[in-house]
C-alpha cells in the first residue's frame, strides 16, 4: 500500500484486516444489514477433507462479499458524501457479519485440528479465516469501532489548511500542501503549511485514536494476540522479527548519518544559523516532504555537481506533454517488456488517475485496488506530472501486477508473501526506470553521461528517496507498537513520537508541540490504520530483488546502473514470486529468488557504496558532526509569522527586481530633486505645485516597488546586499497612506516648511527682518538685552504659533505611516535607522558621560553673562535666559565668545575679520573646502557643482530656503549646495560640513540608489565636521593666512578649546533633547495640550535654559526650529558630534599626528583620506558598526575621543569654577529674569508664571511639586558631581567614558 514517498497503495489483506481497512461508517450506530443466506456457511465435516470443501465454499462467497465491500469503499473514496458513507457502512457491516459467521464456523469445526493439516496452503487459509479481528466485537462495539475508522479517515481526507485571515484560500494536502512542501524554499511558508496540516488533522484525531486503540486491542486479544501490534507482526512469521529489524537498521545507520550531515550542511547554507544548527536535528519542514520521509524534492539544494545534466526530468516530462495516462502506459509497457501481464480493460475504464476537477472530495492518497472478481483492478491516484510521481506510478502498478499474477489463488492467499513483498515489487522496477540509461530510452534524458560525478549525482538523488526514508519507515510502527502495548500512554503520544523522530531521523518539530497535538495522526497510515513496517522491509527487499533480477538479466557493472527493461529472464523469475502470493512462507519465496531466506542490507549497501564513500569524504573535509549531539535545540519562529508566509523566496527574481527598481528610481529621484531644488531656490506657488506632483510620483513609485518588495521573504537570501535593499524598500514610508491622506500629509509638510522659510518679523515702523541673515546676525552680534529679547520672542510668536495648527495632524499622519510600516510610532521608525535595539540607552550613556563637561561650561558661561547683564537678568544658581547665548535656539554659543574668552589678551582666533579684510567670497570659502578634501586624495567636486549650486542668498528678490543643505541629484555627476553664505568663520566651518555631504555623495555614487546614504544618519553629518576640526585649528587658519600666528602656549590653547566647546559641547544637550521631545510626542506621552510646557521642561532639564518671557500653551516654540516643521530627525546631530571626534582621533593617528588631539590637522594626509574614503564608499550597504570599525578599528560609539579632545579645557573649567565657587547645575530652576516677572504680572490675573509658561494656578502647583522632586534629585546629583570632579582633578583627567553610540552635526541633510 505504497512505498516511502507517502503516495502509496493498498495491499491485499487477510479477510478480517481487509474488512477492517474497508470499514467506513456513519457516526451513529444503525441496525446491521443481514447477510444473504446464500453466503452463509453450510455443513462441513470436521476433518481435513471437510476443510477443503469449507475453504472452496468460503472462497466463492468471499469473492462476492469482498467485491461488494470494495465497490462501496471505492465509491466513497472517489466521492466522499454522506450517502456514499451510508452505503459503505452497510457493505462494511455485511463484510463483518460474513467474517464473523465464517470465522466462528472455522473455529467450531477445525480449531483443534487445523494446525495438523497435511496441506500447507489449507493451513494458511483456515488460519486466516479463523482470525476475526473486529468481527469478534459485539454489534454495538463493532459499530463504534467502524464509526471511529470512518471519522478518522474523513478528518484526514478532508483536512485543509487555510491561509491566515483569508478563509477563501484553503489548501488540501494534495496537491497544494504537497507542492508547497516540495517546491517552496520559504522557511515561513513551509512552516505554516507544516504546522497547519499537523494541527488541522492531528489535534481532532487524538481522542478518536485513543478510543480506537482500546477497542482494536480488545478485538485482537480475542484472537489470542497480546495486542493489535502483535497481530500485525504475526504476518512476518518470525519470533525474532523485531531483533532482525534492529540489526538491519544499525547496518544502515552510518550511511544515513552521513547523508543527514551532508544535507544539514546544505540547508545551513540556505537558511543560516538561525534555523539550522550544524550540531542539532533538522527542522522537520525543510526536507521537501510533509513528513520528512523522503528528501528528493530538495535535490536542487544538495546536488553534488550542479553543472552535470539534471537528473530530475520533471521539466522534460511537462515540456513533452506527458499526462497521467501516459505515465501509466509507460509503466505498463515496462511490465509487459518483462513478459508480465498488461492491464485489463477494466483498469483503464474504471481507475481514477487524476484528481477530479468537478469539485468532488476524494481520498487522494495513492492506492491500488483488487476487486476480487479476477478481472477488475484499479488505481486511485491524484497524479501530478513529476518524476517523483512516475516512481509512485510504477509502485502502484507493481501492486496491480501482483494482483494479476495471484488472482486465481484462494482469496485468503491473495496477498504478498509478506506485506513488504507487496510494497517492493513496483519499487524494484522503479530502480530501473530511474537510471539515466532508462530515462534516455524513454526520451526524458537527451544523453547519458557516464562519469563519477554524474554517478554521484544520481546516487545522491536515489539516497534522498531511499536512505532518507529508512529511519522513518522503521520508527512509525515502533511508535504504534508502543501505543498498542501500553508503553506509550495517551499522555505521552506526542512526546514519544518526537522522541523517536529525533532519535532515528535526527529531525525536530519547527514549532513547540505538546500533548494537545497528535502529530503522528498527520500521516495517512495512522488514521487509516495501515501498518507501516512493511515499507522498511520493502526498502531492504527491493534491493535484494533488484540484485537478483539484474543477475538474471545478465547485467555487468555497478548495481546502480542496472536496467532490467525487456529482460524476459528477469520477468520470469519475478513472475514466480508474484504467482506464489502468500501461499508459502515468505522466507521460501525469497530464497527461490535471491538464494537466501533472510532480510539482508548488503545489496542496498552495495548499490549505494560509491555515494556512501563520497559522503564520508565530504563530511570529513567539512568537519561535519555525525548525529545531533545538541538534540534539544529548536529553531525560533520567523519574524512576522504567520502573516508573512506567502512571500517570494527566489533570490534570482529578487536580484532582477532590485535592478529594475534601481534603474527607475534614479530617473525619478533626479526629477524630484530638480523640482525640489527649483522650489527651495525660488519659492513660488507654481513651484510648490510641481514639487507636490513630483512628490506624488515618488510616493507612487515607492508604493509600487515597496509593495512588490513586501512580496519577498529575504530572511534566507545569501546575497546580503539584495537582502538589505529589499528590507529597506519594504518600508513604504509615507507612500503607505491612501492617496487623499498622502496628498493632505504632503501639503501639511509643504505648508509648515513654507511658513518657516517665508517668515519674517517687523518693527512697528514696518521694517521687516527675515531669519537669514538679519535675525541670525542680530542674535550673534547684539549685546542689548531688550533687542535680543524682541528678536527671540517675535520669531517664536510669528513662526511657532503659525506652525502649531498643522502640527497635531502632522503627528497623527506620521504615526499612521509608521504603524502601517510595522513600527509602534514615528519615533520608533526614526530610531530604526540606527539598527540598534539599545539606541536610547546608548545615547543616554553618552550624554551622561559628557554632562559633567557641559555643566562646567554652563556654569562658566553663566558667570560671564552675569558680569555683562547683572543679577537682574542672570541668576548664578538658576537657568540662563535662552536669548543671551548668541543663537536663536541657544544651540551653539560661539557667537558670545567675546563675552566669555578665558584670556582676552591672547591673540584672536576668529578668522572672520581677516576673511573680510582679504576679500573672501562665498565661492572662495567653498574652493578652500574643496581644496581640503582633494589634499587628502579625495574627489574634487565636478563642474556641475560650481555651475548649479546656490552659494549665497540671491539678490534678485527670490524667496529661498536659506537653511544650508547638500543635494544629490542621483545621476552620478550632479551634486549641489544651497547656502546663504556669509563671509565669516562660522560659515567657513559650515561650508566644510556641507562639502562633507557632497564628498560622501561622490564616494558612494556607484552604489545602488538604496545604499546612497550614510552608514547611519549621524555619519553623513559627521564627515564634513571632521574636516572642520582640522580647519578650525590655528595651525590651519594660519596656513590660509587668516591668522597672523600659528598660536602657541597654554592661554592660546584654552581660548581655542573654549571657542570649540561653545560650538561642540554647548550643542550636545540641545541635539539630544529635540528628538527626546518628538519621540514622546509621537508615543503620546506628550499631548498637544502640553507641547510647549514639556518642551521647556526638557530645555531646562538638559540645557539649563529658561524662556526670557512667559510662554503659554498657545505658543509652539519647538516650531521655531527648522527641523521640527521640516520633519527632519535631529538625534543624527547628537550622534555626529560624538563620532566626528572618534573619526578625527583615528584619522589623526593615520596621519601620524603626535601631541594633543585638538592641535591635529589632517590636511594633505593621503593615509587619512584613504581611511575615510573606504568608509564613505560603503554608503548604507553595511550596518554602521562595520563602517565605524573601518575608520576607528572598533564598532562602538564612544565619547572618549571627545573627552580627550577637550581634556585641557575640562581641567581649566573645573579649576576656574571651583575658584569662583560656582554652582554646577541650576538648583533655582523656577527662577525667571525680571522681564519674565514683569510681563507675567501684567497677564491675566488668574494665571501665574511657571518656568516661563503662563499657566493656571493649579497647573503651576502640580508643576512645582514635580520640580521640587527634580530639584532634590539635582542637588544630590550636584553633590555627587562635585565629588566626581574633585577626583577627576586629582587624577588630572576625566573618567574614561562608557562605550556607546555616536552622533552628528548641525546642518540639514537633504539628499533623501
UniProtKB/Swiss-Prot annotation:
- Cofactor(s) in the UniProt record: Zn(2+); chloride
Q: Which UniProt keywords apply?
A: Calmodulin-binding, Carboxypeptidase, Cell membrane, Cytoplasm, Disulfide bond, Glycoprotein, Hydrolase, Membrane, Metal-binding, Metalloprotease, Phosphoprotein, Protease, Repeat, Secreted, Signal, Transmembrane, Transmembrane helix, Zinc
Q: Which residues carry this modification: Phosphoserine?
A: 1305
Annotated residues that bind Zn(2+) 1 are located at 395, 399, 423
Q: List the disulfide bonds.
A: 162-170, 364-382, 550-562, 762-768, 962-980, 1148-1160
Summarizing the annotation, the consequence of altering residue 997 to K is: Abolishes peptidase activity but no effect on GPIase activity
This protein's gene is called: Ace
Q: Which residues cross the membrane?
A: 1265-1281
Q: Where is the signal peptide?
A: 1-34
Glycans attached where? 59, 79, 116, 151, 165, 323, 514, 682, 700, 719, 765, 947, 1196
What family classification does the UniProt entry report for this protein? Belongs to the peptidase M2 family.
A GO MF label: peptidyl-dipeptidase activity
The EC number on file is: 3.4.15.1
Q: What is the lineage of its organism?
A: Eukaryota, Metazoa, Chordata, Craniata, Vertebrata
Q: Does the keyword Hydrolase apply?
A: yes
Q: Where is the Peptidase M2 domain?
A: 45-629, 648-1227
Q: What is this protein called?
A: Angiotensin-converting enzyme
Q: Which residues does Zn(2+) 2 bind?
A: 993, 997, 1021
Q: How does it assemble?
A: Monomer and homodimer; homodimerizes following binding to an inhibitor. Interacts with calmodulin (CALM1, CALM2 or CALM3); interaction takes place in the cytoplasmic region and regulates phosphorylation and proteolytic cleavage.
Q: Which stretches are Cytoplasmic in the membrane topology?
A: 1282-1312
